Amino acid sequence: MKVLLANPRGFCAGVDRAIEIVECALKLHGAPVYVRHEVVHNKFVVDGLKNKGAVFVEDIADVPNNQVVIFSAHGVSIAVRRQTHNIGAIIYDATCPLVTKVHKEVARKQKQNYQVILIGHKGHPEVEGTLGQSSESNCVQLVETIEDVERLNLSKNMSFSYTTQTTLSIDDTQSIIDYLKLRIPTIDMPKKDDICYATQNRQDAVKILMQFSSVLLILGSSNSSNSNRLREIAEKIGIPAYLIDGIDNIDELWFKGVDTIGVTAGASAPEVLVQEVVHYLRDKGATKVIEVGGVKENIHFPVPKELR
């Protein structure tokens, strides 16, 4: 039995930065520090930070006055930002810079009187944050499917632009974009695709891996958007794919009659979990572990200067 490891996999620059911000804040201020939402969507990472003194909350109303508050990598709305300032918090923003870019684009388009169409998953914290960048509730319309595009209320006197959640499936997003262009030929496009580099690279790596694998294991938590997209890509190709938090979630029956197992990790899953899976598979009879070539990533996002 062979094990193929996707490249790139695991932590991206935005996740590295977000975790480092929490750890630096704990070192500077001591526990507790409050984090609005899970800083990244990974159980192993979140549990580790909890053990160091991070307190994760969904509502700023649950934070006492004058405490340290960190915004998660997914970003927050203007209203949440304002609410946090109002309780006298010391604020550190761990929003991924690529998400911040989308936020700034929404604000810029609003000032130019554009109606913004956001392609994303309803209820995802990144989407909630992006929707909340507009001071007008009807400035941004959310679409998830081509059917949503068909139902859009389009004013003839309005200019339109679109943007996307950064962690979507590239293929699925493109079909929605194509339909948007069909419905609104004059729609304004982002200067560059909003799907982040790490999302694209990890999806491309899975497509390569699937050419040689009989089953795919994806290290990633169930609430991780980018990890779920990796699973969906494999399943659309016709390869069984399993999203796991770690080796405790593995079922040996998945490998019955299988000679090649692909392994990857979502952008919020640490490499230590991948290596635990590799050791597990070696113990179960894997004789070869092969790193499959892919794009080399050298992007780094620095933490805020006050934490350096």
UniProtKB/Swiss-Prot annotation:
Its cofactor is [4Fe-4S] cluster. Signal peptide: none annotated. It catalyses: isopentenyl diphosphate + 2 oxidized [2Fe-2S]-[ferredoxin] + H2O = (2E)-4-hydroxy-3-methylbut-2-enyl diphosphate + 2 reduced [2Fe-2S]-[ferredoxin] + 2 H(+); dimethylallyl diphosphate + 2 oxidized [2Fe-2S]-[ferredoxin] + H2O = (2E)-4-hydroxy-3-methylbut-2-enyl diphosphate + 2 reduced [2Fe-2S]-[ferredoxin] + 2 H(+). Isopentenyl diphosphate binds at residues 41, 74, 124, 224-226, 268. InterPro entries: LytB/IspH. Dimethylallyl diphosphate binds at residues 41, 74, 124, 224-226, 268. (2E)-4-hydroxy-3-methylbut-2-enyl diphosphate binds at residues 41, 74, 124, 166, 224-226, 268. It comes from the Bacteria. GO terms for biological process: dimethylallyl diphosphate biosynthetic process; isopentenyl diphosphate biosynthetic process, methylerythritol 4-phosphate pathway; terpenoid biosynthetic process. [4Fe-4S] cluster binds at residues 12, 96, 196. The active site is at 126 (proton donor). GO terms for molecular function: 4 iron, 4 sulfur cluster binding; 4-hydroxy-3-methylbut-2-enyl diphosphate reductase activity; metal ion binding. Keywords: 4Fe-4S, Iron, Iron-sulfur, Isoprene biosynthesis, Metal-binding, Oxidoreductase. Pfam families: LYTB (PF02401). Pathway: Isoprenoid biosynthesis; dimethylallyl diphosphate biosynthesis; dimethylallyl diphosphate from (2E)-4-hydroxy-3-methylbutenyl diphosphate: step 1/1; Isoprenoid biosynthesis; isopentenyl diphosphate biosynthesis via DXP pathway; isopentenyl diphosphate from 1-deoxy-D-xylulose 5-phosphate: step 6/6. Binds 1 [4Fe-4S] cluster per subunit. NCBIfam families: ispH_lytB, PRK01045.1-2, PRK01045.1-4. Catalyzes the conversion of 1-hydroxy-2-methyl-2-(E)-butenyl 4-diphosphate (HMBPP) into a mixture of isopentenyl diphosphate (IPP) and dimethylallyl diphosphate (DMAPP). Acts in the terminal step of the DOXP/MEP pathway for isoprenoid precursor biosynthesis. Belongs to the IspH family. This is 4-hydroxy-3-methylbut-2-enyl diphosphate reductase. It comes from Vesicomyosocius okutanii subsp. Calyptogena okutanii (strain HA). The gene is ispH.
